[in-house]
């Protein structure tokens, strides 16, 4: 499975390289800016479609709170409560894939927000209960992403820092802390 993932990555990279080769100068510039993560590419005409898809994804993720809490106690426990754990996992993959895809499509790949924010919420709330974690993660993610975007504009006129240059400054220390804590 790992090798298949690597091969899909190589094929995708090849397609992107070909598209960049045949693209106009403006197209390549747009792609590079998108690749650095940028909220500036989202216009008001994109917002209704973006919000509709994100709202559906958030609603679907909120439906997963009870099954996720059951899974915290183990797959056998969740199955004894009547949950189909394989279906829950597949549903979770589809919902997170949808939310990640729509955000990446509009804003580019923004590193560390999705990786660090759930851990930040868990550390602040000191709970594993998804009834609290999911809403707080959604709000914390939006707040941290907007804070990082604000930091990007601090240099002043014409000096906008790419979003992916700021998010690792917050996300990487959190991930390192979580990894060190789990080892110790």
Each predicted region: which residue ranges?
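Alpha-helical transmembrane segments in inner-membrane proteins
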Residues: 1-184
């Amino acid at each position: 499975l790992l090798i298949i993932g690597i091969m899909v990555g190589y094929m995708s990279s090849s397609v992107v390289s070909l598209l960049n080769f045949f693209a106009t100068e403006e197209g390549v510039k747009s792609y590079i800016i998108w690749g650095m993560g940028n909220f500036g590419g989202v216009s008001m005409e994109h917002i209704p479609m973006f919000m509709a898809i994100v709202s559906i994804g958030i609603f679907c993720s909120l439906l997963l709170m009870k099954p996720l809490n059951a899974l915290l106690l183990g797959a056998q426990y969740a199955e004894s409560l009547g949950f189909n754990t394989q279906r829950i996992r597949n549903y979770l993959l589809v919902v997170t894939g949808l939310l990640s895809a729509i955000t990446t499509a509009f804003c580019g790949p923004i590193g560390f927000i999705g990786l660090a924010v759930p851990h930040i919420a868990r550390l602040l709330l000191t709970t594993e209960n998804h009834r609290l974690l999911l809403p707080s993660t959604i709000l914390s993610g939006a707040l941290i992403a907007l804070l990082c975007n604000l930091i990007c504009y601090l240099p002043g006129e014409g000096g906008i820092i790419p979003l992916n240059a700021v998010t690792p400054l917050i996300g990487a220390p959190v991930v390192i802390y979580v990894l060190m804590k789990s080892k110790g």
